[in-house]
């Protein structure tokens, strides 16, 4: 049939059926999809929430399967070499802006994840069953004769035009982990559906997304909806992800309904996982050609009272956990602020292109805390930063909770303070006058120097002669030797000060700084955790 006649026919049938032309094409694509081969069953979010609630009232069943030897013993290189056949992509027949492909089970991915395609008009779902014909094994050593039965999948990835079937922009793989890219196309930090007992007396629990349901989008849509069922020994959950793949960012609106099977010591909402090895202020693990190595450089918080917080990340010598109490936070996230290649000199992992991740609550979260876990790491392949929201009210068996929030995967958060922001933090030897770096004579008294740069917020428009006052507090020791320097290159200011110990304590020093003029606050609040050396190490020679 001629393309124009096909369009006319589609519009005529659409008028008869009540579907739009694009909706009809989407329905046709769903009906004829070669990936979804299961029987049609009714599906909606209300039924999924009921299913999750009912599941929480039953004993947990570990669904990890014994994989065939060819999959159980495979290397990461072999696993990554398994390719999905683009001819069997979920929305191949739609020939639209989005498409979905699935990850194979194998290696440590043993939990079979069930996938379903949903017709948004009829609300009927069909399962996509695993079969080897969906994948390409030519570049692997996989013995396909061992691949018998419905092994399920381990996750999925999303593609966006014009690079359908080439470069994915979003992926869900392993437990409840997922991540997305911004305009650079570079993956970075990850998010999770739920965190349980990350920093608790018992072992951390990693819930699994065990099933997904994908609503078929309209042909020209860059937005789609996916539902997920979460399961673990301590909790179940029903999730709705409204995912908008914009030109410069991916935005997810998440509606999470969580049911507690057991009492949960620490529940982590909107958890995110990142890596910080070294940066401008932390050089302990930076003996490489790279000036900085990190997926994120700070935890940013917009508190419920309106205060903006910048907390630079650390790679501590021993595990550190910090809780920042709040009520109805306006947002928080792990941010990669520096996107200059020169700051990383990296042509493999491209840290200069890594996105930030910002959480924006869309429901009232009440009292709780933004928690930050920093774990020692010796290399960039090990994630060592975790951040999430923990409700103040204890979670007991039988409790049901609902959290709504948006996730923004973008170069920088979608919102920022109107005040000056921290541009960079630096730390080094103290106790001497700038311009007279120790050579023949080191300082007689040991100290640690900090340089905090502020920019934006109208600092470049302050009247000449405006007095800039740094307000600094510390949990122990003392701070002095203040300097306020003009930085023309960033149209801002550098605050210099030294910290001096007043005891032998090696407890972390909690530093807090903002700048003001007279009674007007000029900047967000800088929080920093410094780890002083042992008394015998407080010397320069």
UniProtKB/Swiss-Prot annotation:
Cellular compartments annotated: Periplasm
GO cellular component: outer membrane-bounded periplasmic space
Post-translational modification, as annotated: Predicted to be exported by the Tat system. The position of the signal peptide cleavage has not been experimentally proven.
The keyword Isomerase belongs to this UniProt entry's keyword annotation: no
UniProt xrefs under SUPFAM superfamilies: E set domains, Galactose mutarotase-like
Pathway(s) of this molecule: Glycan metabolism; osmoregulated periplasmic glucan (OPG) biosynthesis
Keyword Calcium applies: no
Family label: Belongs to the OpgD/OpgG family.
HAMAP family the record matches: MdoD_OpgD (MF_01068)
Protein's name according to its UniProt entry: Glucans biosynthesis protein D
Organism for this UniProt entry: Pseudomonas fluorescens (strain SBW25)
